[in-house]
Regions:
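Thiamine diphosphate
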Residues: 1-132, 137, 154, 373, ...
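Anionic-ligand anchoring segments at beta-strand to alpha-helix junctions in alpha/beta enzyme folds, i.e.
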Residues: 24-60, 274-301, 421-485, 489
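Conformationally flexible catalytic loops at phosphate/diphosphate-handling active centers
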Residues: 52-56, 167-262
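Conserved thiamine diphosphate
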Residues: 123-173, 350-365, 537-544
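Peripheral docking tails and interdomain loops at the edges
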Residues: 324-413, 544-555, 559-595
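ADP-ribose/adenylate-binding Rossmann-like module
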Residues: 505-527
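Rossmann-fold NAD(P)-binding glycine/threonine-rich loop
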Residues: 520-540
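Conserved small/polar residues in nucleotide/adenosyl-binding loops
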Residues: 600-609
Length: 609
C-alpha cells in the first residue's frame, strides 16, 4: 500500500497517529510535548473528525495531575481519551496511572521522554520519566524515529482497544519529538480497516451509567485484595500477542517488519547491543559502516514493547553466535546494581543458551547528551579490550571521578555516501530556526530526497545560541546525532566567528557562508587567523553576505532569516532558485499569516537574498 509522504516532526506524527482514536484529549502543556496537544487543538477547532465522526473535545486542566484525573473520569464515562506529556508532568500523573491500569481502561499517553530534575533541572531528553512509570501497570511501546512514531503510535491505540491495558507510547524528547523527517503518513480509512469496533462497543457498555449501576473504586481488606489484584494477569499475558498481531497487520499493509524486538546487523554477529529509542538509528548506521568497512560482525536488538517484557521474544531476536552483549540505558538509577533495561535483559537471559554470555551495562545520553557513531564503536570495541574491559561504563562524557567512561577515537563519518549535511549558527529569536524548518520542508516536499532537520538550543531559547542541523540525501537518514562533518556551514551572527570553533566542522571542499558587515580589509582584519588557515588548507568555498544591511533596507530590522535562507538555496543548488523563492513565500504564508505578521515587502527579502 502506497502512503502519502509528508515532512513533519515527531510531535506532529504522534498527533496524527492519535487523532483518529481520540474522543477526548485532556491536556496540560510541558516541553517538549506541548506541540502534540497544540496540533490536536488546531485540528479540533477546524472541525476535523475522528474515526467516530466527531471532532476531538479538548480539556485543558490546571496541571498534569488534573489532566490525568480528567483522563480517568472520561474513560470511566466511556469516551476514548488521550493525553500528551513528559518528565515532571508524567510523574504528576502516576497516582492516576495506577487507577487507570487497575481498572483496565484503554487509553494511550504519548510521551516525549524527558529528563526528570535531580541535582538540576534539565528540559532535554532521556528515559528517567519513562522508567519511573514501569510498575504502574501501563504497557510501554517505544518508537525510535519519526516514522515509527506514526506507525507504532497507531499500534498502541489499536492494541489498547483490543486488550484493555492502557499504553504509554514514548519517544525521545527533542531528538525525535522535534526532529523533522520526511515520512509516510496514514490515511483515516487505512486505519479504520484495522480497528476492532466490537471492542470499542464493549468499552462503551462498561461506562458508568445510572441505568446500569456497578460498584468501582472500593476499599478492599486483606481477605480479598491480593486475589483481586492477580485477576488482571490474563490481560497482561495477552498484550504481547495483541501488539504482535497489530504489528503484523501494519507490516502487511505497508511492507514494514515491526516486531516486539527487532534485530539488525550481521546474522552471525558476535557482539550485540540492546537498546531502545533514537540511539538505535545511530547504532544501525554504525553497524552498516563497521560491518562493511572493517569486516566486523556486529548487531543490535531494538526494544519496541518494553512492558510487558517478553523474555522469550528477546532470546529469539539474539543471534546464536552472540558472545558479548552490551545494554544501553538512557537513565541513571543511583544505588542500583544496574539500570532498568540492563536488569531486564540479565533476568531474561538467565537459564537460556546465553546464560554465560558477558553482559555489560552502559549509560548514555542523559539530558540529551549527544551520542555519536564514534561512541557506539567504543561500546563494541570495549569487549575486545581485554585489559581495559569495563562491565559498567558511560559514553559521551569524560568521567574523571569514577573512571567509567569509554575512550573514543576521533570522529567517525558513518553517514551513507550522497548525504549532504548543513549546519547553521544563529541567535535565539532571530528566525534562523524557523527559516530552516521551512527549508527542510521545502526540500522534503518538493524533491525526491529524504530530509532531516534537528535544532539544538539551550533552555533560554530566546537570546541564546541556536544551531540548526539539516541533512538530505537519496537514502533514508539514520543520523540521530549532531553534525560534526558538514558540507555547508553558515554563521548568521558575525560575533560568533571569534567565539566558536565552527569552520573545523566543514569537510574539505565544503562551503562557508558568513553574515557580516565587513568588507575587504575589514574582513581580513576581523577574521581569526586559524579560520583563514583552515579555509585555505581545506579548499573551503567562502562567501559573505550583509544580511543586516539588506534587512534594514527593506524594513525587516534584525530579522535576517529569510535573506540568509535565500542565500543558502542559491549556494546549495538543491532546487532552482526561482522555485525555491516561490516555495519560501508559500511557506512564510503558511507559517506567519495566522499570526497577523507582515509577509512580504517589495522587494521581498527572499528575492534580495
Amino acid at each position: 500500500m502506497a502512503r502519502k509522504m509528508k515532512t513533519m516532526d515527531g510531535n506532529n506524527a504522534a498527533a496524527w497517529a492519535s487523532y483518529p482514536f481520540t474522543e477526548v484529549a485532556a491536556i496540560y502543556p510541558i516541553t517538549p510535548s506541548s506541540v502534540m496537544a497544540e496540533v490536536t487543538d488546531q485540528w479540533a477547532a477546524k472541525g476535523k473528525e475522528n474515526l467516530f465522526g466527531t471532532p476531538v473535545k479538548l480539556a485543558e486542566m490546571q496541571s498534569e495531575a488534573g489532566a490525568s484525573g480528567t483522563v480517568h473520569g472520561s474513560l470511566a464515562a466511556g469516551a476514548l481519551t488521550t493525553t500528551y506529556t513528559a518528565s515532571q508532568g508524567l510523574l504528576l500523573m502516576i497516582p492516576n496511572l495506577y487507577k487507570i491500569a487497575g481498572e483496565l481502561l484503554p487509553c494511550v499517553i504519548h510521551v516525549s521522554a524527558r529528563c526528570v530534575a535531580s541535582h538540576a533541572l534539565n528540559i532535554f531528553g532521556d528515559h528517567s520519566d519513562i522508567y519511573a512509570c514501569r510498575q504502574t501497570g501501563f504497557a510501554m511501546l517505544c518508537s525510535s524515529n519519526v516514522q515509527e512514531v506514526m506507525d507504532l503510535g497507531t499500534v498502541a491505540h489499536l492494541s489498547t482497544i483490543e486488550g484493555r491495558v492502557p499504553f504509554i507510547h514514548f519517544f525521545d524528547g527533542f531528538r525525535t519529538s522535534h526532529e523533522i523527517q520526511k515520512i509516510e503518513t496514514w490515511d483515516m480509512e487505512d486505519v479504520r480497516d484495522m480497528v476492532n469496533f466490537e471492542k470499542v462497543e464493549e468499552f462503551r457498555k462498561r461506562a458508568l451509567n445510572p441505568e446500569h449501576p456497578v460498584l468501582r473504586g472500593t476499599a478492599q481488606n486483606p481477605d480479598i485484595f491480593f486475589q483481586a489484584r492477580e485477576a488482571c494477569n490474563p490481560y497482561y499475558d495477552a498484550i504481547p500477542g495483541i501488539v504482535e498481531d497489530y504489528m503484523n497487520k501494519v507490516n502487511e499493509k505497508i511492507g514494514t517488519n515491526y516486531k516486539l524486538f527487532n534485530y539488525y546487523g550481521a546474522p552471525d554477529a558476535t557482539h550485540v547491543i540492546v537498546a531502545m529509542g533514537s540511539v538505535c538509528d545511530t547504532i544501525e548506521e554504525t553497524i552498516d559502516y563497521l560491518n562493511e568497512k572493517e569486516g566486523t560482525k556486529l548487531g543490535l536488538v531494538k526494544v519496541r514493547l518494553y512492558r510487558p517484557f517478553r523474555a522469550d521474544k528477546l532470546v529469539e531476536a539474539i543471534p546464536s553466535t552472540c558472545e558479548q552483549i552490551s545494554v544501553l540505558d538512557r537513565t541513571k538509577e543511583p544505588g542500583s546494581e544496574g539500570e532498568p533495561l540492563y536488569l531486564d535483559v540479565v533476568a531474561a537471559l538467565k537459564g537460556t543458551q546465553f546464560h554465560d554470555v558477558a553482559i555489560a551495562s552502559g549509560r548514555y545520553g542523559l539530558g540529551s547528551k549527544d551520542t555519536t557513531p564514534a561512541q557506539i564503536k567504543a561500546v563494541y570495541w570495549n569487549a575486545s579490550w581485554k585489559d581495559t574491559y569495563k562491565p559498567r561504563f558511560t559514553i559521551g562524557i569524560e568521567d574523571d571521578v569514577t573512571n567509567l567512561s569509554l575512550e573514543t577515537e576521533g570522529k567517525l563519518d558513518s553517514a551513507p555516501a550522497g548525504t549532504t549535511a548543513c549546519k547553521f549558527w544563529g541567535l535565539g529569536a532571530d528566525g534562523t530556526v524557523g527559516a530552516n524548518k521551512n527549508s527542510i520542508k521545502i526540500i522534503g516536499d518538493h524533491t525526491d530526497l529524504y530530509a532531516q532537520a534537528y535544532f539544538a538550543y539551550d533552555s533560554k531559547k530566546s537570546g541564546g545560541v541556536t544551531v540548526s542541523h539539516l541533512r538530505f540525501g537519496k537514502t533514508p537518514i539514520k543520523s540521530t546525532y549532531l553534525i560534526n562533518q558538514a558540507d555547508f556551514v553558515a554563521c548568521h551572527n558575525e560575533s560568533y566567528i571569534t567565539k566558536y570553533n565552527m569552520v573545523q566542522d566543514i569537510k574539505p571542499g565544503g562551503t562557508f557562508l558568513l553574515n557580516c558587515q565587513w568588507e575587504h580589509e575589514e574582513l581580513d582584519k576581523h577574521l581569526p587567523g586559524q579560520v583563514k588557515r583552515y579555509i585555505a588548507e581545506n579548499n573551503i568555498k567562502f562567501y559573505t553576505i550583509n544580511g543586516v544591511k539588506i534587512g534594514k533596507e527593506i524594513g525587516l530590522g534584525n530579522r535576517i532569516n529569510t535573506v540568509l535562507q535565500s542565500a543558502f538555496f542559491k549556494l546549495a543548488n538543491i532546487i532552482p532558485i526561482d522555485d525555491a523563492i516561490k516555495y519560501m513565500k508559500d511557506a512564510a504564508t503558511a507559517s506567519y499569516s495566522k499570526k497577523g505578521c507582515l509577509l512580504y515587502t517589495s522587494p521581498s527579502p527572499r528575492d534580495r537574498g
